[in-house]
Amino acid sequence: MKKKKIFIGTIISCVMLALSACGSSDNVVTSKVGNVTEKELSKELRQQYGESTLYQMMLSKALLDKYKVSDEEAKKKVEEAKDKMGENFKSTLEQLGLKNEDELKEKMKPEIAFEKAIKATVTDKDVKNNYKPEMKVSHILVKDEKTAKEIKEKVNNGEDFAALANQYSEDTGSKEQGGEISGFAPGQTVKEFEEAAYKLDAGQVSDPVKTTYGYHIIKVTDKKELKPFDEVKDKIRKDIEQQRLQDTTGKWKQQVVNDLLKDADIKVNNKEFKDTFKFLEKK
């Protein structure tokens, strides 16, 4: 089974289903070099896009069955799209083959439901595990342990950490800022790095820490006092939700897809599409 995309454009899906319902021999195109009938076009579309379309349709049904989306929620998303696109909004609707905003609202409902599904993966345990003090963290990343130890020795001898980061660090995203990691928070770095960082107090520098990226010398430049859990739990939850919505690995999106489609108890009755949901059996 080919790897599935989470959401695929719906316009070809609509065209394909409309044509397949016709099954007509009427010509869609006539030319000197040959004609194309509705039946031929329908067959071609089914072969190329049928599996993806069926997958998307079932995913949308599963999402909207479990996560209800109101017209008001969809309308809000449409208004956000209008503000973002400005004068291009109307032409974009036309390019998508949509007649009006109401049709766009319906198309957006599964995606809104998907956002709700991703957010629902955040548990109370996740929130508790991310209950940690706010910190500002800098680091110097190098490939080998020998170099890391040499740099740590320079830090111990009083050399400026930021200057050393600018000179030696191989993390191009932070070296120009003296090694400072923008927006450091739980769950945003690899486990070894995070555990080492949270053991440090403000002003402390770690020994070399090995991760899959290399060796890090970590410095905590600021560490806030931990606020009461009840004061920050909502913010922690929202932060985790945003992390998962923006996760580029696709881990949380795929987890949602697998769980929803498994629970849907899908049975494919058409041999042409018998392998569409085979990937669920391997999970």
UniProtKB/Swiss-Prot annotation:
Residues 1-21 form the signal peptide. The keyword Cell membrane applies. One of its GO terms (cellular component) is plasma membrane. A lipid is attached at residue 22 (N-palmitoyl cysteine). Its EC number is 5.2.1.8. Residues 132-222 form the PpiC domain. A lipid is attached at residue 22 (S-diacylglycerol cysteine). InterPro entries: Foldase_PrsA (IPR023059), PPIase_dom_sf (IPR046357), PPIase_PpiC (IPR000297), PPIase_PpiC_CS (IPR023058), PrsA_foldase (IPR050245), Trigger_fact/SurA_dom_sf (IPR027304). The keyword Signal applies. One of its GO terms (biological process) is protein folding. Pfam families: Rotamase_3 (PF13616). It is a lipid-anchor. It catalyses: [protein]-peptidylproline (omega=180) = [protein]-peptidylproline (omega=0). It is found in: Cell membrane. Keywords: Cell membrane, Isomerase, Lipoprotein, Membrane, Palmitate, Rotamase, Signal. It is an enzyme of class 5 (isomerase). One of its GO terms (molecular function) is peptidyl-prolyl cis-trans isomerase activity. Belongs to the PrsA family. Plays a major role in protein secretion by helping the post-translocational extracellular folding of several secreted proteins. This is Foldase protein PrsA 3.
